[in-house]
């Protein structure tokens, strides 16, 4: 079957033809490891896991290489490390934060049924490649040194002759539109407002490496150069698919294209650019100020959303019910619907032998049309085709055996019930003791009232 994918650059759906069918290559921007991943972060992880599975099905497992990076150098990481480990040297504190957060991320996405990428490179392990690209850009006249910074010049890129794309092509915006439509940091070391940082000097105590381009002061990379370096190292100068959230189109992916194409004198960095849409929660933008910010871990292990925890397979199916390019509204009702479907499918097909279903494959090869694929799964269930249903679930990455909620959920509920009884008996000492016990488990209690004015206690994992 012919695979057709929507390309953000060309703004149309077209046949996917890999550069080398024996070596299909995909890069997806991964997490910055400073905190628990939120449910919006889960969307690209799940979407491109489905694409990874489909590519492996079409071209063979040995012929698909999926790279998803780990960003382990960032101001947010530095801030978190200084806050959480004030008594440690910053570099040691950073290592603790990044290693712990990376483990948490893997635990969460494993629970969502996602395969591990072929390669998961860390930014700090690719400083040499970043320096090399920066040196190429400076030598080619696309970047310049100013006040111990190295900056890329989009104007220089657009003035160059040859095969290079126009800066702004991916976002479909001109330089003037980018300035008008975005907050652009006009620092004194910039020649033009649209210039962006490739390398910057480190502050005392911050992570630092020898700088490129003859700069004597140690420094660290800018955000965008990291992905250009890691994709080059593991996939080459040009590869098949680059994916991520739609929020990354500009500036991150636009700047990746600029860096890579100018460094290697290529027309394209990736043959196909894919971006998933935004996520909102119960009709509102997710934000901490609205109180609807929720992590994957909280969905899996607390009662913060819908008064209960949810199985990873349920979260996965709920995410896939909306086409990846469309905005998704994350609701409790959608999770209940997904759970009902999985329970029904699992009971029906858990002992079946997986076989291929062409209608299901056809839906996925049409730009990952997961809503249509899910409709086909329902049709298989109605038709009593257990083997095909089991095969489709397997391809979609949904385990037919629904896991029970994690033990922490039951433990917390039991303790909360005991505390509620203690409070009813005005045994404040016991109530406080239980609160402290839960706090030691990393569980934060919130006392309040429901719509009827009845006292209720909810809980969430401490960050």
Swiss-Prot record:
One of its GO terms (cellular component) is cytosol. It comes from the Bacteria. CDD domains: CysRS_core. Its main location: cytoplasm. Zn(2+) binds at residues 29, 227, 252, 256. Its cofactor is Zn(2+). A motif ('KMSKS' region) lies at residues 285-289. Keywords: Aminoacyl-tRNA synthetase, ATP-binding, Cytoplasm, Ligase, Metal-binding, Nucleotide-binding, Protein biosynthesis, Zinc. A motif ('HIGH' region) lies at residues 31-41. Pfam families: CysS_C, tRNA-synt_1e. Belongs to the class-I aminoacyl-tRNA synthetase family. This is Cysteine--tRNA ligase. It comes from Rhodopseudomonas palustris (strain ATCC BAA-98 / CGA009).
């Amino acid at each position: 079957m012919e695979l057709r994918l929507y390309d953000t650059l060309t703004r149309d759906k077209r046949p996917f033809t890999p550069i080398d069918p024996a070596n299909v290559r995909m890069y997806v921007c991964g997490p910055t490891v400073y905190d628990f991943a939120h449910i919006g972060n889960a969307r690209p992880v799940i979407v491109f896991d489905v694409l990874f599975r489909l590519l492996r099905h079409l071209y063979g497992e040995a012929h698909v290489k999926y790279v998803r990076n780990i960003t382990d150098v960032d101001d947010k990481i530095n801030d978190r490390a200084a806050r959480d480990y004030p008594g440690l040297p910053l570099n040691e504190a950073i290592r603790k934060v990044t290693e712990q957060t990376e483990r948490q991320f893997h635990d969460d996405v494993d629970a969502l049924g996602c395969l591990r990428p072929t390669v998961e490179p860390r930014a700090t392990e690719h400083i040499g490649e970043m320096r090399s690209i920066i040196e190429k850009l400076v030598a080619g006249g696309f970047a310049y040194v100013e006040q111990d910074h190295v900056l890329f010049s989009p104007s220089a890129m657009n003035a160059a002759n040859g095969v290079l794309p126009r800066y702004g092509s991916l976002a479909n915006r001109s330089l003037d539109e980018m300035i008008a439509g975005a907050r652009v940091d006009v620092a004194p070391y910039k020649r033009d407002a649209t210039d962006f940082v490739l390398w910057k000097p480190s502050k005392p105590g911050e992570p630092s490496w020898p700088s490129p381009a003859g700069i004597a002061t140690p420094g660290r990379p800018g955000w965008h150069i990291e992905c250009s370096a890691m994709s080059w190292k593991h996939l080459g100068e040009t590869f098949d698919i680059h994916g991520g959230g739609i929020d990354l189109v500009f500036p991150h992916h636009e700047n990746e294209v600029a860096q890579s194409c100018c460094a290697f004198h290529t027309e394209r960095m990736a043959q196909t650019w894919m971006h998933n849409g935004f996520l909102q929660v119960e009709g509102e933008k997710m934000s901490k100020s609205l109180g609807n910010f929720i992590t994957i871990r909280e969905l899996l292990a607390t009662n913060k959303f819908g008064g209960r925890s949810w199985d990873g397979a349920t979260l996965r199916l709920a995410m896939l019910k909306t086409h990846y390019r469309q905005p998704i509204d994350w609701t409790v009702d959608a999770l209940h619907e997904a759970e009902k479907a999985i329970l029904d499918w699992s009971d029906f097909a858990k002992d079946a032998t997986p076989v291929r279903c062409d209608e299901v494959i056809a839906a996925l090869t049409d730009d990952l049309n997961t809503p249509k694929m899910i409709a086909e799964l329902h049709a298989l269930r109605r038709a009593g085709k257990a083997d095909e249903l089991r095969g489709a679930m397997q391809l979609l990455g949904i385990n037919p055996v629904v896991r029970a909620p994690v033990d922490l959920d039951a433990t917390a509920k039991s303790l909360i019930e005991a505390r509620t009884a203690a409070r009813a008996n005005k045994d404040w000492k016991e109530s406080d003791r239980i609160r402290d016990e839960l706090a030691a488990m990393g569980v934060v209690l919130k006392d309040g009232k429901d719509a009827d004015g009845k006292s209720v206690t909810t809980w969430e994992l401490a960050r």
